[in-house]
Amino acid sequence: GDYWIVAARLGQGKTWTLIRMAVAALYADSTVLYCALEQSRAQIAMRCHSFLSGKYSKQVFKTLDLMHGKDFDLVAYRQFLQELKDKLDGRFIVNDTSRGRVSPSSIAAQIERNRPDIVFIDYLTLINSGGDDWRAMADLSGEIKGLAMRYEVPIVAAAQINRMAIGNDLPGAEHLAASDAIGQDADCVITMRQMSQRVIKMKLAKFRHGMDGQIWFNEFAPNSGRFEEVSGDNAQDLIDEDRSNAD
């Protein structure tokens, strides 16, 4: 199994990106294990429901509305959840153990118990590494890579970009925070930067099995269940609109 990293600064959409990838795996009827170290099971589920309702429901259920418990049709929402059971053969398992209580051994136990097709870790530096220096983080990254290889399951983990990358148009694998070993261990590193309210710019910063350096754009409107690739021209139009609306 491969070890992938999705990296960005704080508040740039890492969790949304991981959830979008997890939902794509659900569409393929896969069993997904999602280790949520920062948010609760309910918060992760509501984000998933926003994406899923964009495909399986006439009404898109916005995440903020679900979290606040208002401004949506409760009967329609319950019907949507019931119908999901018939439309999806995949399983979505969320482990929302509090930060610091998750370790590589506990993730291994979850893998053995649930036999997932793919694992997501949100996010890497919240795992109990047994220390707070770069050596401990390097050891942790190596253990996560080892889990992917031992169980032959892909593992995708969110990670932070360090402060040196601030102002960089799109950071590379060398800008991963905590330890250079994370980028060295990873088979694939995707870095991302939010260009405006609705546009995220992404870069394949490292790909062990082929060419890297590719750049693409996503339209990011999670409350309406939209997270889709757009052309560079369309991305620029959205950026201009967002900046105009902000002025």
PLM regions: where:
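The Walker A/P-loop phosphate-binding site
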Residues: 1-58, 245-247
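Helical hairpin unit composed of two closely spaced alpha helices linked by a short loop
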Residues: 116-157
